[in-house]
Amino acid sequence: SAELCITLQYRRSDTMKVEIVERFMEYIKVTNENIDKEHICCAISNNNDIQVSSKKEWLKEQFREGLVFLKSVERGKCFIEYLPAENAWNPITADGYMYIDCLWVAGSFKGHGYGAELLDACMEDSKNKGKKGLCILSSGKKKSFLSDPKFLRYKGFKVCDEADNGIQLWYLPFAADASLPEFKECARHPHIEEKGYVLYYTSQCPFNAKYVPIVEEVARENGVSFQAIHLQSKEEAQNAPTPITTYALFYDGAYLTNEQMNDRKFLKLLSK
């Protein structure tokens, strides 16, 4: 890495030398050939950990569907995950687009432009594959586990559809005449008939393998009706009653949140 030393001059003629280190990031594409030895960023542990094993099994299946997982070679949350929109695990119609199901840069990796680098790599790859553009889920204001709308807007994305619960579909077309992606009708008005707590989730997020059973146990201990529906195919996910399928919690039919629950958060929710 390149290092630069500058001198700052203050009014009292004090001087202070500050070392600025310019960071360069190296990325690697995770494939079936190297997945067993590579970490998957958001769940860094050994392959026997339930969070790691469930996510890696899901990834292996999705690689056959065209999924790309590009990540930093360093340990931590710095990666992008995308696949052809026809194979996305969400109720969207976006033929010819590439769907980004996760773009996450966190901790010490934030503020260095790595998110932009990952997105640029996705754009270049998608153009080379003849895609019409990119699409991704977000919202009007920043929400947990969704891309920052300010960042998306800065990169040229625009809102092309919105569900009743405020979840938005954003797109970045590569041609002016590209068709607009849209939510399927089942996702526009997130509502279900079942009473009590109902969770729709997939194995796309590794934390689900650990925390869904924990929340189920908390619900049992507190005599609360809780049903967990594990979407196990793209067809099930593409017809789910929610634009977000990675984690969508309902209560008495109404959509509550996409924020993942652990025992502490769920108990806090029950106390309201």
Q: Where do the protein language model's features map onto the residues?
A:
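Conserved beta-strand in the GNAT
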Residues: K71, R75-E86, Y99, W104
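Conserved GNAT acetyl-CoA-binding A-motif
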Residues: S126-S144
